[in-house]
Amino acid sequence: RRVKEQLKKIGGMEFYDVNFSYIDNDSFEEHYVSVPEQGGGKLIPEGMGKPGSVYTVSKSKTGMIGCYMLETQMMPGNGKLTCTGIGSGKEPKEATNTAFNYLKANGNRISGQISTTTKDYIINYQDMQGIGMTGNLALPTLIAICSAALGKTPLNSLAILGEISIGGTLIKVDELASTLQVCLDSGAKKVLLPITSAGDLGTVPSDLVGAFSLIFYSTAEEAVFKALGVE
């Protein structure tokens, strides 16, 4: 365990596959995200994931674009969200609060089965490339919680792009071409994209656009439904 924790702290690409199975002593059992035969060395593995596990690609606080994994556990409780791995930065913490507050206000528009009063949620955030945490975590956090609460596995090989404000306004993707390139390098085959970014696709090389199934959303609720494969 100590070796794994040290490798995680060192970060960097050469150690990312250690994270396919790891233990968080505070809250988690051992988690297996994928097996090497499935993942083929990609950050976003092929094959079915599990409820509450999602991947997002966005810009870190250092300005670099990276891939981040969220893993969620739900348990009986009184409506508390605990986030591990986000570090001490203000933006990531605010984004996770935005997601939970949005869910409290609008959860019934997604599903009556999602409780923010009788369940607690624990989410572990992983900076897969060791470049620093991103602040764009509200939408991925919302999708991760809904996935865990509904017991629905997200679409496989999916990268979540874009962000939402506390009021649900869509925030388009910065540097779309570079972000999609990181999605491709990370192993994504499907990309969830805000409709507000559609106009920027003209700036992206056509072969890069053609590398994915692009899935557009126009509201936060629609993003949740489409990420979970619910029509």
Region roles according to the model:
Residues 1-8:
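C-terminal helical "lid" of AAA+/P-loop NTPase domains
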